[in-house]
Amino acid sequence: YIQLREAGLLEAYQSPELTDVPEAYQDEQGVWNPIYIGTLCFACNTDWFARTGTPMPTCWDDLLSPALAGQIVMATPKSSGTSYTTLATLVQMRGEDKAWEYLKKLDQNVGAYYTASSTELVKQVSTGDYAVAIVFYHDGRRAVLDGYPIEVRSPADGTGYEIGACALVRNAPAGERENACTFLDWMTSARG
């Protein structure tokens, strides 16, 4: 949204439904409207951890355990917003040099490849192909609600987040602006 705003492709519109949303999660320029916050977490296959007796990770450094060699799945930050958020989080928490050192160590525990997108990660952990996926909390929680042997764990030493948003496109057909505003109001409401 920031790039679209800077390119002048979005029109300022702030839904009246945002009165209960803290300003820290809103766009200072009033262009995009927040609709959710997604925090990074570890989606862990409880069957795998019970079978191996390996402790479930509680912090980022736990992912470096030799017991998790080849058992972590994540997407590449080149194409995945989830993994880009992971990279940015680690840089903010540890500083750039220490973050890259950490990622080199983590790479030793990542399975055969990095996926292009994070959409498949929870499925791979749900079916037992891997023990841990680094994903957004809502993706892991969905697997829990669907009955998979998943436990969602937030890193105790801190984590990153994304703000999902929606915005009004500039120069949309004049007759559709009112409908678009109504939709944005619904998306930012408790019902949306």
How would you describe each model-predicted region?
Residues 1-3, 131-149:
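A ligand-binding cleft/hinge motif common to bilobed small-molecule-binding domains
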Residues 1-126:
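Extracytoplasmic ligand-binding site segments that recognize negatively charged/polar headgroups
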Residues 34, 41-43, 71-75, 131-135, ...:
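Structural recognition of the beta-strand scaffold that forms the well-ordered cores
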Residues 38, 102-107, 114, 146-170:
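Periplasmic-binding protein-like
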Residues 43-48, 87-88, 163-176:
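A bilobed periplasmic-binding-protein/Venus flytrap-type ligand-binding module shared by bacterial periplasmic
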Residues 58-66, 165-192:
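Bilobed periplasmic-binding protein/Venus flytrap-like ligand-binding cleft at the lobe interface
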Residues 68-72, 98, 128-131, 148-150, ...:
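Loop/turn elements at helix/coil->beta-strand transitions in domains of secreted/extracellular proteins
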Residues 121, 139-140, 192:
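Alpha-helix capping/helix-boundary segments
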